[in-house]
């Protein structure tokens, strides 16, 4: 690493998960390279209890913002002008103790890289979700394994929002931000942001960056709104040019098929009927020329 280690900030946008957020902050204790600071932007004041914060090695700062993942993440960006790298994590992502140290090494060694991400070995977002205890055990098992050789980088289309780090010099030089026309949970906001940043460097994934994503279901938005966003947001991104037509149409088709084929046999943790209804409403709006990500605010 360089003589002056990179200053890395951690940003967490959160909504309706006060207890889970507290557990996640506790998991940031003991990083082999402590964060320069941790910024938490809650959707509502009561979503973040800052009365008794753990010692993560740097200050934990409350950031205020209007509700909405993109707006909250942009508010965090505005507070990290003194840092080199910003790592966004979900409020239910537990990074391994060496995560920040490895991340700093990657950004120093690869000056052409602008976004680094990883796809967790254990990701509750793809199923019913993982428990806190499961995540702790997975981290323990990982720590007991021999340290692997540094994994190579692999170029990828976009960063994964649950752990997405960005080189801040690129962000500020080109005035890059999350698109606040994607309201509330900002479906596919990580793809949109990544493709905008990708114009200025490489977007890579590195599996040696280990963490566990619980995929907590508490605090999720309605199925109807999500279903609408599954159509409206890719259409919006394709039209503005941040998402390829091939990628966007594949996203829409995949979600339509999933929601329809599982309509009568849905997973207990997924509102397939609500999502299918939202898909249908968005397709109707697309047909009459009024489809827009912001329409979910009316549903």
Briefly describe each language-model feature range.
Residues 12, 16-30:
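Short, well-formed alpha-helical segments that are part of the catalytic scaffolds
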Residues 98-132:
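Conserved donor NDP-sugar-binding/catalytic core segment of glycosyltransferases
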Residues 25-63:
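Acidic donor-binding segment of Leloir-type glycosyltransferases
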Residues 158-166, 170-176, 180-209:
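A short, conserved alpha-helix in the catalytic core of glycosyltransferases
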Residues 181, 185, 202, 206-224, ...:
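Active-site donor/metal-binding and catalytic loop motifs
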Residues 225-233, 244-299:
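Non-catalytic, C-terminal membrane-associated alpha-helical segments of glycosyltransferases
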Residues 70-85:
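Active-site nucleotide-sugar/metal-binding loop of Leloir-type enzymes
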Residues 135-157:
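Short, flexible, basic/aromatic active-site loop/helix in glycosyltransferases
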């Amino acid at each position: 690493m360089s003589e002056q280690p990179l200053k890395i900030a951690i940003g967490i946008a959160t909504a309706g998960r006060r207890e889970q957020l507290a557990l996640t902050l506790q998991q940031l204790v003991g990083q082999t390279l402590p964060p320069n600071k941790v910024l938490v932007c809650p959707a509502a004041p009561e979503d973040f209890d800052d009365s008794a914060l753990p010692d993560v090695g740097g200050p934990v700062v409350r950031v205020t913002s209007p509700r909405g993942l993109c707006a909250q993440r942009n508010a965090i960006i505005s507070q990290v002008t003194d840092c080199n790298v910003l790592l966004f994590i979900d409020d239910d992502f537990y990074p391994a103790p060496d995560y920040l140290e490895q991340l700093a090494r990657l950004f120093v060694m690869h000056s052409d890289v602008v976004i680094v991400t990883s796809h967790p070995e254990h990701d509750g977002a793809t199923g019913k979700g993982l428990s806190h205890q499961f995540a702790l055990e997975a981290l323990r098992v990982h720590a007991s394994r021999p340290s692997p050789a540094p994994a190579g980088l692999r170029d990828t289309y976009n960063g994964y929002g649950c752990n997405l780090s960005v080189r801040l010099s690129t962000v500020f030089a080109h005035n890059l931000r999350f698109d606040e026309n994607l309201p509330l949970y900002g479906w596919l906001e990580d793809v949109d942001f990544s493709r905008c940043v990708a114009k200025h460097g490489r977007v890579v994934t590195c599996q040696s960056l280990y963490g566990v994503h619980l995929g907590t279901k508490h605090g999720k938005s309605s199925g109807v709104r999500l279903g609408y966003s599954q159509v409206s947001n890719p259409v919006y991104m394709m039209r503005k040019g941040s998402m390829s037509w091939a990628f966007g149409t594949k996203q829409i088709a995949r979600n339509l098929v999933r929601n329809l084929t599982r309509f009568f046999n849905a997973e207990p943790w997924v509102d397939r009927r609500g999502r299918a209804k939202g898909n249908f409403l968005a397709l109707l709006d697309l047909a009459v020329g009024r489809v827009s990500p912001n329409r979910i605010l009316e549903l």
